């Protein structure tokens, strides 16, 4: 079919969507998805499936895995969207966040808030009706903790913001366990602690890199209010705690060398990098914080992959 001539009347066919309208709709959908911060959600969900495998001591039903992941994505997306709504004033001051939809005004603040609340309601109903109500309660707790304790409470007030507030990112571990068992067991509690102690090194490394952004926005992240030597010592301390708890998972969860050997090797690798950072900071040398940031993602991914392997073997 030949293309219509320039200046021709647009089609009256109701099934044909004008290109401009389609492009605007696509951009709008992308903006709402961007509010959910799916790249962050992806990291959170890395821990969910391995914990489900451990709780089941095998492979749970694909239906349960799919529903849990979808509901978990919507739950985390709800918390992230509301976070974007609350932080829209400081996001415009930070180079890392100034392209977010609310800063660019491609989504109205009220619409973003309604979207975030709707995601939370849908995820809660999905967990409650399709998984179990224990998981639903944990999901609501995660959203509430992230929004009220971290975003509204600690983020702009305390250098310990990410230490305490980061607990919200640990809830997928508990939800993964409860989705299978309907309860929260000790292995899940220890894995929660692994992610809890992992969070400060992960985010402080990022905050070192974007220290000026946080300072401009008035967010008292530890690298803004403390010396680099102090920050790297804290990173090292939390790294040791993280590794110690990760090793304690093996006897408590009754899993063997398939998990323990990788946990030891990964832990040694991570602690060695944390030591390197602390030593270079003490000498006043460049520390390359993003190296630890990316290593932390690899560490957590491989640790939970080892957990999944141990659960299946």
Swiss-Prot record:
Pfam families membership: UbiA
Localisation per UniProt entry: Cell membrane
GO cellular component: plasma membrane
GO BP annotation list: heme O biosynthetic process
Pathway stated in the Swiss-Prot or TrEMBL entry: Porphyrin-containing compound metabolism; heme O biosynthesis; heme O from protoheme: step 1/1
Source organism superkingdom: Bacteria
Protein EC: 2.5.1.141
Keywords: Cell membrane, Heme biosynthesis, Membrane, Transferase, Transmembrane, Transmembrane helix
Intrachain S-S bonds: none
Chain segments annotated as transmembrane: 33-53, 59-79, 107-127, 129-149, 162-182, 188-208, 212-232, 252-272, 292-312
An example molecular function term from Gene Ontology annotations: protoheme IX farnesyltransferase activity
Known catalytic reactions: heme b + (2E,6E)-farnesyl diphosphate + H2O = Fe(II)-heme o + diphosphate
Function: Converts heme B (protoheme IX) to heme O by substitution of the vinyl group on carbon 2 of heme B porphyrin ring with a hydroxyethyl farnesyl side group.
Assigned protein family: Belongs to the UbiA prenyltransferase family. Protoheme IX farnesyltransferase subfamily.
Additional facts recorded: Carbon 2 of the heme B porphyrin ring is defined according to the Fischer nomenclature.
Protein name: Protoheme IX farnesyltransferase
Organism (species): Parafrankia sp. (strain EAN1pec)
The organism's taxonomic lineage, starting at the top: Bacteria, Bacillati, Actinomycetota, Actinomycetes, Frankiales
GN (gene name): ctaB
């Amino acid at each position: 079919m030949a293309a219509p001539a320039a200046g021709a009347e647009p089609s009256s066919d109701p099934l044909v969507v004008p290109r401009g309208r389609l492009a605007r709709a696509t951009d709008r959908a992308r903006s709402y998805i961007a509010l959910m911060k799916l790249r962050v959600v992806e990291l959170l969900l890395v821990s969910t499936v391995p914990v489900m495998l451990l709780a089941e001591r095998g492979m749970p039903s694909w239906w349960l895995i799919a529903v849990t992941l979808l509901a978990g994505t919507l739950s985390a997306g709800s918390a992230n969207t509301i976070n974007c709504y609350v932080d829209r004033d400081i996001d415009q001051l930070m180079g890392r966040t100034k392209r977010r939809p609310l800063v660019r005004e491609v989504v109205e603040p009220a619409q973003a808030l309604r979207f975030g609340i709707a995601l939370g309601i849908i995820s809660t109903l999905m967990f409650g009706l399709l998984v179990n109500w224990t998981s639903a309660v944990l999901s609501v707790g995660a959203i509430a903790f992230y929004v009220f304790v971290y975003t509204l409470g600690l983020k702009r007030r305390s250098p310990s913001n990410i230490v305490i507030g980061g607990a919200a990112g640990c809830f997928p571990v508990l939800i993964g366990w409860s989705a299978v068992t309907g309860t929260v067991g000790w292995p899940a509690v220890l894995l929660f602690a692994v992610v809890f102690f992992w969070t400060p090194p992960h985010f402080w490394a990022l905050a070192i890199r974007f220290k000026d952004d946080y300072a401009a926005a008035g967010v008292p992240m530890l690298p803004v209010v403390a010396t680099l030597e102090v920050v790297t010592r804290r990173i090292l301390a939390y790294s040791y705690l993280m590794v110690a708890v990760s090793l304690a998972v093996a006897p408590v969860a009754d899993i063997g060398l398939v998990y323990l050997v990788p946990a030891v090797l990964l832990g040694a690798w991570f602690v060695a990098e944390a030591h390197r950072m602390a030593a270079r900071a003490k000498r006043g040398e460049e520390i390359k914080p993003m190296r630890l940031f990316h290593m932390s993602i690899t560490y957590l991914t491989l640790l939970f992959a080892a957990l999944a392997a141990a659960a299946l073997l």
